[in-house]
Amino acid sequence: MTLQRFLKEYGLFGSILLGIVAYRPLSVLSPMIPYVLMTMLFFTFSRIAPRDIRPRPIHLTLIVTQIVLALGGYFLVRYLPVPYAEIYAQAVLMCFLCPVAAAAPVIVGLLGGSIAIVTSYVVINCLSIIITGPLILGWLGHPQGTLLESMAHVLVGVLPIVMIPLLTAFGIRWKLPTLHAKVRSLSSASLYIWIFLLSLVIANTVHFVAQERHGVATMIVVLVLIGLVTCIIQYAVGKAMSRRVLGESVTIGQALWQKNSSISIWMIQSYLNPIASVSQAAYSIFQNIFNALQVIHHDRRQVREQRSIHKESA
């Protein structure tokens, strides 16, 4: 077994387990997360060409789907005759409305999907959330600060993390082709960085949940279940859309359901009841477990296919 396959098989879950068990010391390293993420994205973006980054009709479909699920889920839950219905509705809203994760292109690359389509969507979705997020939450929630301040926060929080590694990768491709070829040859770098990053993200998420002590136990359990259910719904819807449009289940699936939990948690704490952000934290843990399972399944399928080819050629 190669080192790369070993890390795909065991390193991902080991990273998740480490983040849960050692969340206190690892959460201290949380300020490193944006920089580690940008480094990981740099290696991923080195594999695509500038001409591949462009708007596509599916991007608009994804944005509309996201908003419909968010508002539909909110109003469906908001008027249920149960305690804390408004908090649960806010949690559902944000689990659907949350912008796509900047790391989505990395996972898509590991799973063999279209990095270009998802990278384009990360930028487009960020720009759309800058406008629609504060407007929707200003309507349904209790905003802190002006609309322009909220839009600026989302812009500063997301766009540089994507654009800096993207422009750096394209600049090296244009000016330093030899270096670009060397970087491109390091195809497994994203995996190694992701394993390290995953432990930090999980630790930061667990630390956040541990700090939320003001909610009753039943409410916390329901909020965690909301994170799981909305994760499964978007996973299933995204996979189905991807199969229908692209003939494969990876690209659009990841674009719809892999979320930027840090931005979402900030939006909840700025506009809604802060306890609702427990759902988003739980969503982050579930999506990373799903991602690890997907990578392992994809790797094992590739190994089986390679063995089958070798047997046929022999």
Question: PLM features: what roles do these ranges have?
Answer:
Residues 1-314:
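Alpha-helical transmembrane segments of multi-pass small-molecule/ion transporters
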